[in-house]
A protein has these predicted regions:
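Catalytic adenosine-cofactor/nucleotide-binding cores of aminoacyl-tRNA synthetases and other
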Residues: 133-227
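Active-site cores that bind ATP or allylic diphosphates and position pyrophosphate for catalysis
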Residues: 2-161, 165-166, 179, 204
Length: 227
């Protein structure tokens, strides 16, 4: 039930040189206005008054969460250093963390490939699978290396800045109306585009750089994707 102002005050109060961005975690959750620090009657009253509130996952204390990544092998997290992520926002909309788990479950996803920027969130997702649907139903995960631009993770702004496409085909931002030209409009053939993508973060252990689609299918191995 914390207001944005109360959350900001908490961050300012707990901010230190070694911890510049304090998190909402086990060390401070009982100091905030939530169902752990309030009685059930107090919580129910706030809900009945339509007090804006979010729903968070309560991370367990001192528990090691592990899963096997198809690229990185065994990955483990200490839940003591993971914050209590918001699952439902004050407007009732789910965050990515809840939505992706429910969506994968409903669509019966067996293998999930995503960028390595989501690796720090994997502990939350493993626990959500365990709590909601059973860990045994969780898809196999592969956290892929990111495609980088000159200054870090590739963004659509890099295309305009450095003069190269970042999308397979022209893409229009629904909010801003900004149009970003794609590889197809630049005249790149699909076979060349697929070949280029395949070589970003993977090779077959040889010096070969040009592959037909059939060759890629035959020679590709997830074990040879770069970590």
């Amino acid at each position: 039930f914390d207001t944005p102002e109360e959350l900001e005050q908490m961050r300012i109060r707990l901010r230190t040189e070694s911890n510049p961005t304090p998190q909402y975690d086990l060390s401070i959750r009982t100091q905030m206005r939530n169902s752990l620090s309030l009685s059930k009657e107090e919580s129910d009253e706030l809900i009945q008054k339509n007090t804006p509130h979010v729903i968070r996952i309560k991370m367990p204390e001192k528990e090691i969460v592990s899963f096997t990544d198809m690229i990185r092998g065994e990955v483990s997290f200490d839940t003591s250093v993971v914050d209590d992520k918001v699952l439902l926002k004050a407007d009732g909309m789910p965050t990515y963390h809840l939505a992706v788990v429910v969506d994968d479950h409903l669509m019966k996803i067996t293998h999930a490939f995503r960028g390595e920027e989501w690796l720090p969130s994997a502990s939350v997702h493993v626990l959500l699978w365990k709590y909601l649907f059973g860990e045994e139903h969780m898809p196999q995960w592969a956290h892929l290396p990111l495609i980088l631009g000159p200054n870090g993770k590739l963004s659509k702004r890099d295309g305009a800045k450095y003069g190269f496409p970042v999308f397979a085909m022209t893409w229009k931002d629904a909010k801003t109306g900004e149009v970003t030209e794609g590889f197809r409009e630049r005249g790149f053939l699909p076979e060349a585009f697929v070949n280029m993508l395949a070589m970003l973060g993977w090779n077959d252990g040889t010096e070969q750089e040009i592959f037909s689609l059939d060759e890629l299918i035959q020679q590709f191995s997830i074990e040879k994707v770069h970590k």
